[in-house]
């Protein structure tokens, strides 16, 4: 779970609505947060200029290629992967304490990072929280051969998305679409395997 002193926790709606003073540009914000959204609903992304009525204004967005926060995570992991585990731990601790913890709280992952593997798992947890919904962590999980588990008791994933995979998921490899291979049959023999149906959804 996300530390209660980590401001990123408020990117999702807490089941205990009284734990945080949620603010919204909506005129019905009090009712909206109390009754209009499910627990853990994502509220990380907000409409531009607070305009949720006019999509031409509220839908405007910047598409950044790389956030500076990503560089901090890359440096911490690279330092540890390069043989300096204490140095990687120090870098992650400094970033989290200086930029993510609130009210003077200190983040320290030393106890969770006795090995390189345990440190990378902790770093990836923080990175997944940081970049939720931004579409970059899949590449790290693929590179690190990490497993994913979407099917379990209490999951809120839709039924067809409850896929449990040990190691790299087959659907993380891009498959050239059928329309393209029909128009250019030579590339059909160079395509990645179609992952459809390879992983059965968890049924409980």
Walk through the language-model features, giving the residues of each.
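Acidic/polar-rich alpha-helix caps and helix-coil junctions
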Residues: 2-204
């Amino acid at each position: 779970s996300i530390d209660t002193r980590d401001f990123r926790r408020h990117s999702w709606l807490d089941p205990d609505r009284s734990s945080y003073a949620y603010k919204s540009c909506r005129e019905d914000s009090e009712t909206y947060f109390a009754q209009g959204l499910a627990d853990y609903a994502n509220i990380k992304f907000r409409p531009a200029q607070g305009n949720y009525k006019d999509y031409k204004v509220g839908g405007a967005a910047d598409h950044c290629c790389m956030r500076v926060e990503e560089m901090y995570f890359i440096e911490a992991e690279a330092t540890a992967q390069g043989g300096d585990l204490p140095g990687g731990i120090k870098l992650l601790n400094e970033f989290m304490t200086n930029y993510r913890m609130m009210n003077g709280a200190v983040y320290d992952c030393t106890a969770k990072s006795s090995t390189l593997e345990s440190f990378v798992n902790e770093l990836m947890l923080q990175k997944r929280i940081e970049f939720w919904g931004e579409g970059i962590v899949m590449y790290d999980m693929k590179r690190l051969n990490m497993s994913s588990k979407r099917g379990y008791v209490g999951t809120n994933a839709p039924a067809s998305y409850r896929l449990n995979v040990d190691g790299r998921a087959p659907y993380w490899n891009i498959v050239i679409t059928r329309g393209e291979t029909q128009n250019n049959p030579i590339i059909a023999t160079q395509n990645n395997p179609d992952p459809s149906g390879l992983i059965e959804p968890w049924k409980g």
